[in-house]
Every structure is written in C-alpha cells, then in structure tokens.
Amino acid sequence: MLKRKKLLQGFLKFLPLIIPATIFVSCARRESNHLIFNISLDHDADASISKFFELYSNNLSKKLDKKVTVSFNIIDDSFTKISNIQTAKADFAFVNSQSIKDNGIEEFNLILQTQTDAFKEDTNLDYYSDGQLKSKAEKMTTLFSKTPYKDWEDTAQQWTGSRYNFLYETNKLINFYRGMILITGSEEEIKKIKEAWDQKKWSDFMNYGIGHGSSGSAGKFQLPDLLLRKHFGSSYPGLQNAINQNPDKFANVRGREIGRDNKIKIVFDDANSFAWTHNDKNATNHFYTPTENNGKGDSEKSNNKNNKVEILTYTDPMLYDIGIVSDTLSDRYQKAIAEVFVELAKTKQDIYGPSYGYNGYNLITDPNKEILDVIHKTYG
C-alpha cells in the first residue's frame, strides 16, 4: 500500500507538467503534406495553370523544407470559398472584399492582398470626401475620347489581346478598383445632367434614366449606390428603393451599350470597362458609341450621331481580392503560402495571377489598417 501511495504522489507531482503538454498537442495546428486552394479562373486560362501549381508546390516545399503538394478547385463564388475555408474543405482562397465585409473581418486570417495594374489618372486610394473622384473622371474622359472608341485600332491604342495598354500606367500597381457613372447625350443634355449632379437634385438626375447591373455587382450597382447616398443625402432613397418606386426610370443596361436607348442617359459600370473591351471595327453598332437608331430600327431613329459619352465620376474604391487562409494551419504554413505567391510574381513566374487580373501581391501585416479602414471609408 505504501509503495502504491508513493507512486501516486510521484504521478501527481509531475501532473502539472503533463497537462500543458497534452493541451499543447491537442491545440497544435496542422502542417499537412497536401493543401487545397479554392481559386477563380478566367475562361481563357488553360492547362498552364496546373503547371503553375506544380511550380508553386515545389517552391512551397523548399520554403517549408518538406514535401507539400497543392491541388486547386475552381470556384467563382466568394461566399462558397469562405464556407469551404471555415469547414476545412479548403486551406486557402482568394475572395472579394465584399464577402469579407459581409462576414466580418474578425472571422478571417487575411494574409495576402492582390494588386492590379493602375489606370492612368487613378493611382491613389482617394475617396469621395477627398473631392478628387470627379476630376479623375474628367481626365480619363479626355484620354478616352481623344479618338472615338469606334475608331480604336489594335496598334494605335496598343491592344494586347486582353486590354488597351495606352490607358494604363507603366509599372504601377494598386490594390483597389472602382465603379464609374457614364453619361451620354448632346452637349446640352450632358450639361444639364452635370448640373443636376452638382446641385444635388436627385429627382432631376434620376429623370434622365439610369442603367445598372445586378444587385450583386460591386461596380455596376453597390459602389454607385454608396456614392449616391453620400452625394445626394436624404433626398436619395437608395438604389433598390428608387428602382421599385420609379421602375420606368431604370433599366438593366451594360456600360458598353450606353447610347442605344434614348430613355437611359446614365449608366453604372466597372471603372474604365472600355479598357478591356475590344473594338470590332466591322460592328454595326459599336460599343460606347451612341447609335443613330438606338439599335431598334429605322422607326425609332434619332439625332444621336453627334452625342457624346463621358465619365461623370468614379466611385469610392473597393479593395481588390484578398487571400484568406485556414486558421487550422500553423503560422509558418500561413506565412509561407503568402510569401510564395509574392516571390513568384516578383520573378515573373506567376502564370495564374495575370490570367485573372492579379499582377502582384502584398503581404498583409495589419488587417485593421490595410483592410478594415478602407472598407469603412467606402461603406461609411
């Protein structure tokens, strides 16, 4: 009995050392040999993306000093990607900043900010409160309309196969995008639309007819809606309410089709969408070009051929896609996953990113300052 008592006392003596070790093991985050990434993929991307992730796996293995393979699933919806991260069906994903705003920043391990090439005249993260959005738009309008869009040529306007390079800054990356408000009409009509805007007369502005995208679109609905709330104040009921109250003043219209419907003089679109929209010189009705017959036949001909298209203003910025990682992975895994993307981009080995508009990456070191502050300034 005495011997058993001494053994028990000895066990109890070392119990405080055993318990923390047990807890540490049970809470240790994993360092898996196989990782699953959820990515979006452009329809023009090909099998080279698989080769990229082979290269990515090799670089990640070297950084972690162990064999790690990365496989990917193609998923476009950010909310599905987030769900997969939260339920351990995926280890890493690029998601849009709207989904992070809707779910709450505290829910995520934000490790990577994607970047894209900057447009001319818009290289800084300016907001409506700074008073620069309209002047930026005016400068881009000058560049856009120097040669009418219908006359743009591959050589003169530097078409690369995916965009017109003359609209972009050289070697300048930014981490945001915007929406824009396009307007069309005769010089007199455009003057009056601008007056309604400058005088903050919502009803007058709306009566010119507004084209918009789906309610889930950032550039074609959400960002313009946020801007209108700030600009028109209490006289503006919100975009969806305005549509419900005055359905005859609104229509679902693509920005590139502006000028085809005489009842719609204002259209919301992704900022500078003409930059990646190729001009077909043989087209009957050119994009971003008011048509003489509105595309509806001779019975509705109008004097549109002298009408213009301008950018009235840009919207506040929305952050470009953000890389999130599962919190079940160890810190060194999380750091390595982000660093490999950055390194491959800097050495021009990133095949995946540019295929989807990611031209660079930044490591996120302060999520509150780098992400949350921007979201708050845009959403108010």
From Swiss-Prot:
It is a lipid-anchor. Keywords: Cell membrane, Lipoprotein, Membrane, Palmitate, Signal, Transport. It comes from the Bacteria. Its main location: membrane. InterPro entries: CypI, CypI_dom_I, CypI_dom_II. A lipid is attached at residue 27 (N-palmitoyl cysteine). It is found in: Cell membrane. A lipid is attached at residue 27 (S-diacylglycerol cysteine). Pfam families: CypI. One of its GO terms (cellular component) is plasma membrane. Residues 1-26 form the signal peptide. Residues 285-304 are annotated as: Disordered. The keyword Lipoprotein applies. P37 is part of a high-affinity transport system. This is High affinity transport system protein p37. It comes from Mycoplasma pneumoniae (strain ATCC 29342 / M129 / Subtype 1) (Mycoplasmoides pneumoniae).
